[in-house]
Amino acid sequence: MNKKRDSELAKLRKLLEDVHIESEETAHHLRQKHQAAIQEMQDQLDQLQKAKNKSDKEKQKFQAEVFELLAQLETANKEKLTALKNVEKLEYTVHELNIKIEEINRTVIELTSHKQRLSQENTELIKEVHEVKLQLDNANHLKTQIAQQLEDTRHRLEEEERKRASLENHAHTLEVELESLKVQLDEESEARLELERQLTKANGDAASWKSKYEAELQAHADEVEELRRKMAQKISEYEEQLEALLNKCSSLEKQKSRLQSEVEVLIMDLEKATRHAQQLEKRVAQLEKINLDLKNKLEEVTMLMEQAQKELRVKIAELQKLQHEYEKLRDQRDQLARENKKLTDDLAEAKSQLNDAHRRIHEQEIEIKRLENERDELSAAYKEAETLRKQEEAKNQRLIAELAQVRHDYEKRLAQKDEEIEALRKQYQIEIEQLNMRLAEAEAKLKTEIARLKKKYQAQITELELSLDAANKANIDLQKTIKKQALQITELQAHYDEVHRQLQQAVDQLGVTQRRCQALQAELEEMRIALEQANRAKRQAEQLHEEAVVRVNELTTINVNLASAKSKLESEFSALQADYDEVHKELRISDERVQKLTIELKSTKDLLIEEQERLVKLETVKKSLEQEVRTLHVRIEEVEANALAGGKRVIAKLESRIRDVEIEVEEERRRHAETDKMLRKKDHRVKELLLQ
């Protein structure tokens, strides 16, 4: 019985040892798996942490670059608006300059036509001067004939005067009177010289206004012809008078008184004829001088006109260049508008991409929070599983301790019973049967107790197996959750790569926009230069207008003074006309014509001077435009400095935003570090439990 019991106890011990060995092997296997899984999780978490740190750094960099690009785009838009305003102003100024250029061209055309008219009038006046010379030659020939006739008559009269002393005395008195008349003639010749000087001026003026006064010149020619006729009539009358004198000389004794009166009349007529001849000679000389002066003046005027035409051609070429530059500026403005539209579209796309990136980041943050919550739930479930495992391990240890105690008790009891049996064998061999009965009963009791203990231990083993299965299931669930987290992390990494790629595209687009902005800035500088030139031209044109107004006022005053002088001269000529006969009337008419021509010549001279002043002013306008270009460069530099200051302000705002985002990211990192610490603590506890 003892052997059977020992064998059964050995079997039970073997079973318990096998179960204990199996449980230890399974626990060791599970610990190894759990440690490997925890190590993998730790490596993955470290890699994820590193990747997250890198992604955070790159995210910060890209956000900073994106904000800088947005600031640059805003500044570019502002500069574009200012450039468009400046372009509109330049277009307006260029339009005004074109109008002024057209007016200048019209004035130039008028001056050229006026020059042609003056040249035509000069040629006509030269022809008229030649005709007057021919007429003077004819008059001189007539004068010589008349002088010869007078000499003949004088010879006759001298013969008669020898006979008649009284007539000589009377002739002497007549000579005295003639000398006085010569003095008067000298005075009148001086007045005539002054008149001829005025006539020279008038002829110069007539060179510019001949086309208007051709009819008057023809009338003057008709009057000259009438004067010739009158002179011929007078000459015929003189001849008749001479014949009468000859007849009277034959009858001097009879008609003494008549001869004296006729001689006096003849002397007066002679004096008039000589005076008229001298006046005509002086007039011819003066006309020749006037003609030479007019030729010189015409040559000077032609030289000035040629210079003015050359300068006008240069100015027209410069104006054409300016128009070409204006067309270039207009094309550049259109290009700027198109590029601005492209930039606005790119900016809208970049903003939409940034909004999408922010939305995705927000979704990722929500997913991270959800994963953290799931991780917290898993950690709580893991803690509960650990507590259950610890409880089961404590139960197992208690059962092992109880089994050891029971085995020790049974061994003690068996030893005691063996001793008692041996004592009973030695002492009471009689009581063997009783002891056998008791042993049988004890064996039955032991069997029942062993069966009960076996069942109890089997139930405990099944419970332990169930707890191990539950722990394995929990471990499998943890591995699944870890795999899910790894998949989510891979998805986040892919999403991060996409965001990084989009940010790289945005950076490339920003580089393109920066280059476009630089090109736009260069074009803006050119437009500003053109605008400043136009403004300067406008100011100079206004100054020229004011100067022209002042010049017109001065010319009006000069015209008033000339009118007063004209009235004085007319009064003087009227006095002379009252003194003189038909010849003086003709001179008065010619003087009036000369005065008109002088006024017209002065007006033409003033026009030429104004033309020269306009050309000088155009040169000053050109210089002022160059100065405006320089000032435009300075203004553009100032505008760029202001734009940079505005960009710096926007960058400061964006940096403050980036700092806020960085603070939020650091808080998220801190939370993530805390969760990592909690996971590490849990892993450490799991390892400790597995080691136990």
From Swiss-Prot:
This is Paramyosin. InterPro entries: Myosin_tail (IPR002928), XRCC4-like_C (IPR014751). Keywords: Allergen, Coiled coil, Cytoplasm, Motor protein, Muscle protein, Myosin, Thick filament. Belongs to the paramyosin family. One of its GO terms (cellular component) is myosin filament. It is found in: Cytoplasm, Myofibril. Residues 16-692 form a coiled coil. It comes from the Eukaryota. The lineage of its organism: Eukaryota, Metazoa, Ecdysozoa, Arthropoda, Chelicerata. It comes from Dermatophagoides farinae (American house dust mite).
